[in-house]
């Protein structure tokens, strides 16, 4: 099982990744190269990235699943402080989209209840939801990767992968 250890100081961080809602294949391929990765919970939250959205392949092409977040008046909100907005029916919509896109695939009936439980767990913060999902994905893919979280903002390090998964950088 993938372990999750809290809070790493800047001098011990080696491979810095963003929090991700259903990490894309590129994220997983890069993460599997390391025995451990650090999720940056103290970075400035960036909208329209893997932090709150995931793309799935539906019958009509690529469909973006977006977790709505509460707007904050602060200009620079850290990722660990981003709250999920439950005023919309996003959970139901995401689960329906996943069922519609993948309901007839092998093992769907085995995995879907676990995905449903994670999405319906209704954590307050986006990073909590993403951590549950990432840990679950790593476990199902048998990736033995230690996950840690930053306890302070890190401007940059050698293996800084926070911005390479953004569509803006492609």
PLM regions: where:
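Residues lining hydrophobic/aromatic ligand-binding pockets adjacent to catalytic sites
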Residues: 2-170
């Amino acid at each position: 099982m993938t372990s999750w250890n809290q809070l790493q100081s800047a001098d011990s961080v080696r491979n810095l990744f963003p929090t991700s809602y259903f990490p894309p294949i590129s994220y997983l391929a890069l993460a599997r190269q390391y025995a451990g990765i650090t999720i940056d919970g103290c970075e400035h939250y960036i909208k329209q990235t893997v932090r709150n959205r995931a793309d799935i392949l539906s019958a009509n092409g690529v469909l973006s699943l977006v977790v709505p977040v509460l707007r904050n008046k602060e200009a620079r909100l850290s990722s660990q402080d981003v709250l999920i907005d439950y005023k919309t029916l996003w959970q139901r919509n995401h689960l329906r989209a996943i069922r519609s896109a993948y309901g007839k695939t092998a093992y769907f009936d085995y995995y879907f209840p676990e995905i449903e439980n994670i999405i319906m767990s209704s954590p307050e913060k986006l990073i909590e939801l993403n951590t549950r999902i990432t840990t679950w994905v790593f476990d199902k893919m048998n990736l033995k990767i230690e996950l840690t979280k930053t306890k302070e903002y890190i401007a940059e390090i050698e293996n800084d992968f926070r911005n390479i998964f953004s569509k803006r950088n492609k």
